[in-house]
Amino acid sequence: MAKTYDYLFKLLLIGDSGVGKTCVLFRFSEDAFNSTFISTIGIDFKIRTIELDGKRIKLQIWDTAGQERFRTITTAYYRGAMGIMLVYDITNEKSFDNIRNWIRNIEEHASADVEKMILGNKRDVNDKRQVSKERGEKLALDYGIKFMETSAKANINVENAFFTLARDIKAKMDKKLEGNSPQGSNQGVKITPDQQKRSSFFRCVLL
């Protein structure tokens, strides 16, 4: 029997290959952790429905490949995203340095008002840390976006990160609706029973 969802939010996970984007996604969507995931090929997505302020919000979360050869494919998914999480690995300096490049990709391909958040993942491996929390916080401050350190393995801040991003998107949408502003490309999608989309797992494999 079809359920009614009040809103559908499209979220995107981006960042270098190997930073743990897929693990973060599976921790949030399945409350599970698997250290043997292979690198994402193309695009995957998962769906989870949450409740915020008495509204049921269906989150469609897209996990993108970090490898350069998939960049053209993955940037096509930026448009229409309402929230983007930029993920780096706190034990990998290069993945942190590349966050600025990922932000440039967002500026080139995503809607101007997309909500963004930076995640410093693998917080559980503190003994191998190369990027301090303070540097992550400063980078986020430079761009005026939120920051959290997470661990998909130890289940630290993953739930909090997704709920915070969803709450920010909803607040922005509510403000637009209250102001009766013209509908933009990133307006929330209200869902009725006949418009339910499949919540099955999808993988786009490039041969």
From Swiss-Prot:
It comes from the Eukaryota. The modification Phosphothreonine is found at residue 72. GTP binds at residues 17-23, 35, 39-40, 66, 121-122, 124, 152-153. Regulated by guanine nucleotide exchange factors (GEFs) such as RAB3IP/Rabin8 and RPGR which promote the exchange of bound GDP for free GTP, GTPase activating proteins (GAPs) which increase the GTP hydrolysis activity, and GDP dissociation inhibitors (GDIs) which inhibit the dissociation of the nucleotide from the GTPase. Activated in response to insulin. A motif (Switch 1) lies at residues 31-45. One of its GO terms (cellular component) is phagocytic vesicle. SUPFAM superfamilies: P-loop containing nucleoside triphosphate hydrolases. Phosphorylation of Thr-72 in the switch II region by LRRK2 prevents the association of RAB regulatory proteins, including CHM, CHML and RAB GDP dissociation inhibitors GDI1 and GDI2. Phosphorylation by LRRK2 is required for localization to stressed lysosomes. Its main location: membrane. The keyword Cytoplasm applies. The modification Cysteine methyl ester is found at residue 204. Its EC number is 3.6.5.2. Gene3D superfamilies: P-loop containing nucleotide triphosphate hydrolases. Its cofactor is Mg(2+). Pfam families: Ras. It catalyses: GTP + H2O = GDP + phosphate + H(+). One of its GO terms (biological process) is protein localization to cilium. The small GTPases Rab are key regulators of intracellular membrane trafficking, from the formation of transport vesicles to their fusion with membranes. Rabs cycle between an inactive GDP-bound form and an active GTP-bound form that is able to recruit to membranes different sets of downstream effectors directly responsible for vesicle formation, movement, tethering and fusion. RAB8A is involved in polarized vesicular trafficking and neurotransmitter release. Belongs to the small GTPase superfamily. Rab family. PANTHER family: LD44762P (PTHR47980). This is Ras-related protein Rab-8A. It comes from Pongo abelii (Sumatran orangutan). The gene is RAB8A.
